[in-house]
Amino acid sequence: MKICVNRAEKLGRYIDPTRWQNSTLRYSPPEKFPAYMSGQIGRAEIMRTWITLDEYFDYRTGTFYPDYDIGVARYPVEELHYPYDWKNIVPAPSGTRFKAYLTSHAKEADELLLNVRRFEREVSDGVITYDEYESIFENAVEYCKKLAPNIRYIECCNEVDIRSFGNLTAEEYSKIYLCAYRAVRRLNEKHSYDIPLELGGFAAAHPIACWDMMREVVERLKAAGVEMDFYSYHHYETSSTIGLVKKHKLDIAGLSAVGKIRHLLSIHNEMLADFGLPKKKIFLNELGRSRTTGIDGDALYNAAGIITYLLAFGCSDDPDIYPFPWCTFHNPELQISFTQFLLCEDGSFAMTPNGVAVKMLHDLSGERLGVTVKDAYARDSEYCAVAVEEDNVIDILIANPSGETVACELEVAGMPAGDYVLTRYLCDSHFNNCVTAKKCDGKSIEKTADVIRKVGETGVFKHYFVLEKDAFTLYRIEKQ
């Protein structure tokens, strides 16, 4: 793989693509975590948060639990009307309750997106009425907005196209969405919020594979005189490919990850045009490369992909689609593949490769330089590297999201003759990887090498190195 940086090609200021992040409720972190997180990867412009209606309200007794104990089922799973994802839920060791979870994340974000989920099957199956669901939804959102006034976006349900989250039809989801629409409209009228609530959805797990469902939902809402204020989709590359193959959409399954997301944007905009609807924000608010696993090696695999996805879609003040990597904190036994941070036995936190990748992207600053990548094994190779310059210091982030160990050649053109210090910060299976490398504590990103490189009259800086599969590295070049 050859990475060519042209110092003379200025592309404008680098824009941080990590400004949109996900929290998790299923394995809530300690109350101190959001402040720590923002110190590492920056304050979120939008943080996605959650409330689970079946934990907030017991429809059997009519009791509300405003500060509920997260992840503790009120009844044995076999006694529930529908199991949802309860089999994968364990109470987090943090013991964080709902109020602390929501307010601690609200303090570290400009705005919140609140996903409201569960009771999808209860209302669809007639266990509770639509009027009851609407009242519960309104009560929950009003309570959360009081705790966190910076909530702007309300997301109606999550991944209802799969079994763990309700397995709804378009008709069933549309009825639920209209309940949420009426509830949000009343709250906005009642309170005249400084930050009005906006409602959207439906956070589809496999949006391309179930595109007919999305079109039907939008068509049904339009017939009711309702438009979504924003749209939300998810993309997990491995699962997306499998889902598309199962649907016999082999041509789309064969696209690269970036290609699939661009295809999603294309059919989304076609849908809006077909129905005569205006463009609204599109949140890709769960994004990953790996499967959902507890396999240690999948953390590095996912991180390398996240770098390319964020560079492809996040480096804009007004992106076509807002990428939210999944996720800042989760149960490592179930989602080591995705979580950016871990809770250590002493109560401190450690960065996984996903956290290292996000932090490296966040910490870049300066004028973006032109970069070309040649002879890469990886797909979407144009997003495998980014270079910036600030005060004559050049930072270059390079990822190898392929299944091969590759020899790499780095060239930087336009350098004055002289000696340069090249500092390397490598993340692979051995370095800056607290998941697979026992010597790494994950507290900071440690430099892994310093070398001197001489630039002659040609003005070309050259360096040769090797990246193992799915490794990534940050190089810093400074005049000696």
Where are each of the predicted segments found?
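Noncatalytic carbohydrate-binding groove/subsite architecture in carbohydrate-active enzymes
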Residues: 172-309, 316-319
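Short, internal active-site loops enriched in acidic
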Residues: 119-121, 159-162, 204-209, 287-292, ...
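Histidine- and/or cysteine-centered catalytic micro-motif in compact active-site loops
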Residues: 236, 287, 328, 399-402
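Non-catalytic accessory regions flanking glycosidase/transglycosidase catalytic cores in CAZymes
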Residues: 1-153, 167-207, 223-227, 273-279, ...
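Flexible glycine/acidic-rich beta-alpha junction loops that bind and position SAM and/or redox cofactors
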Residues: 241, 291-292, 326-340
